[in-house]
């Protein structure tokens, strides 16, 4: 399954064994640890096991990881995740991570747009949300706002960064019904 829109510079596809190095690079990028709960590097062995056992059924495991592929080069450039999926409430949390040299070039926006289309079409999801650091993630805040997400709440002192706690902004988008 590759999901794309013909004019999009990216496509989304399932995780493959060949994605080991991409996963290794992103999961071990300590600059990303500040915006998630990971604080430990992963070995290639552990990631290889993860890839081999990664279920691709959102209904079964309530999460789905897709690889972002740059259409022009066919190279994997990032990861987009759906987590905390609630079929009853038709919602899921999203997160995205791109290779450093691909950030700020519009790939994030295009990937999230594709994810919106995919989740709405195949899973009936009507609402997506993201938790974003309010302290210093202007690029992510700007990206979600440009895609029509609203900052609906601030979770004070929600996330520990170093010795401090920072606020997290909750961005939400109610997806319009497709005809």
Identify the meaning behind each predicted range.
Residues 10-11, 16-36:
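Short amphipathic alpha-helix that is part of the acyltransferase structural core
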């Amino acid at each position: 399954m590759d999901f794309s829109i013909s004019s999009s510079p990216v496509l989304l596809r399932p995780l493959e064994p060949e994605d080991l190095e991409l996963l290794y690079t992103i999961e071990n990028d300590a600059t990303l640890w500040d915006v998630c709960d990971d604080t430990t590097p992963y070995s290639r062995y552990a990631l290889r096991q993860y890839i081999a056992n990664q279920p691709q059924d959102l209904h079964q495991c309530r999460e789905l990881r897709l690889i972002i592929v740059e259409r022009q080069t066919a190279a994997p450039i990032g990861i987009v995740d759906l987590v905390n999926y609630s079929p009853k409430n038709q919602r899921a949390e999203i997160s995205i991570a791109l290779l450093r040299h691909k950030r700020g070039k519009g790939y994030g926006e295009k990937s999230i747009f594709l994810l919106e289309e995919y989740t709405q079409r195949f899973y009936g999801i009507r609402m997506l949300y993201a938790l974003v650091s309010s302290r210093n993630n202007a690029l992510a805040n700007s990206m979600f706002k440009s895609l029509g997400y609203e900052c609906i709440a601030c979770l004070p002192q929600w996330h520990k960064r170093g010795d401090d706690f920072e606020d997290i902004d909750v961005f939400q988008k109610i997806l319009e019904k497709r005809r």
